[in-house]
C-alpha cells in the first residue's frame, strides 16, 4: 500500500498500519516538527518526508492508495479559545481536503482517514460536508489507558464502530489482522 500521511507526527499511522497487518510499500509523510521527524526517521528510515502540508501537491507524488492524517485541533478543542477555522492551525484542514482531492484525480479509489477532537456540531458539519462522510466518535479508553474522545472520518467501507466498554472501537477490516 502506498500511504500519504499528512500532519504525520512520529509516524504512529505507519505503526498502526503495520500492527494491523497492512503491508506498507511506500510511506510519504508531511510533518514540520523536526523532533517528530527525527523519531519517525529513526524507526522507519525508508519513509519519505516532503515538508509542510501547504506545499504538498499530488501531481508531484506517485499514485497513493491511502491518505491519513489528524489536522491540528487547537481551534476546535474545548480546551482552546474556540476559534474554529479562524485559527490558522485548524485551517490546515482545508489543505488536507485539497491534497485529498488532488490525489483522487490520480486515483479515484483512494481511501482516507482523518482524525480530530470532538468539537462543536457546526464545525464538525463543515468537515463532514468537505469529506462527504459522517464521522464516527471513538474514545481511546476502549483501547488504552487514555480517555480521549475523538472523531474519525473515513471512506473505508469495511470499518465499522462497535460499542465497547463505554467507548467504541473499530472492527478489524477483512484484509487486516487483529493484534
Briefly describe each language-model feature range.
Residues 51, 68-69:
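Redox-cofactor binding/interface segments in oxidoreductases and associated redox assembly factors
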Residues 10, 71-72:
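Active-site glycine-rich loops that stabilize anionic/oxyanionic intermediates
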Residues 1-2, 21-22, 123-128:
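N-terminal start-of-chain detector that recognizes signal peptides
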Residues 1, 25-27, 108-112:
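Residue-level recognition of the N-termini of beta-strands and the immediately preceding loop/turn
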Residues 3-57, 92:
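SAM cofactor-binding core of SAM-dependent methyltransferases
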Residues 56-66, 73-179:
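Class I S-adenosyl-L-methionine
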Residues 7, 67-68:
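Short glycine/serine/threonine-biased micro-segments
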Amino acid at each position: 500500500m502506498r500511504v500519504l500521511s499528512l500532519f504525520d507526527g512520529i509516524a504512529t499511522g505507519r505503526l498502526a498500519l503495520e500492527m494491523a497487518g497492512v503491508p506498507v510499500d511506500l510511506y510519504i509523510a508531511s510533518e514540520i516538527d523536526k523532533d517528530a521527524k527525527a523519531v519517525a526517521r529513526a524507526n522507519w528510515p525508508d519513509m519519505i518526508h516532503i515538508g509542510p502540508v501547504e506545499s504538498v501537491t499530488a501531481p508531484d507524488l506517485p499514485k497513493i492508495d491511502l491518505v491519513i492524517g489528524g489536522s491540528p485541533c487547537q481551534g476546535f478543542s474545548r480546551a482552546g479559545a474556540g476559534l474554529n477555522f479562524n485559527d490558522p492551525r485548524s485551517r490546515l484542514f482545508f489543505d488536507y481536503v485539497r491534497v485529498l482531492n488532488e490525489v483522487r484525480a490520480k486515483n479515484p479509489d483512494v481511501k482516507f482517514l482523518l482524525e480530530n477532537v470532538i468539537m462543536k456540531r457546526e464545525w464538525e458539519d463543515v468537515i463532514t460536508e468537505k469529506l462527504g462522510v459522517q464521522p464516527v466518535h471513538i474514545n481511546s479508553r476502549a483501547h488504552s489507558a487514555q480517555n480521549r474522545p475523538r472523531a474519525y472520518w473515513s471512506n473505508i467501507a469495511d470499518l465499522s464502530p462497535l460499542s465497547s466498554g463505554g467507548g467504541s472501537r473499530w472492527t478489524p477490516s477483512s484484509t487486516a489482522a487483529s493484534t
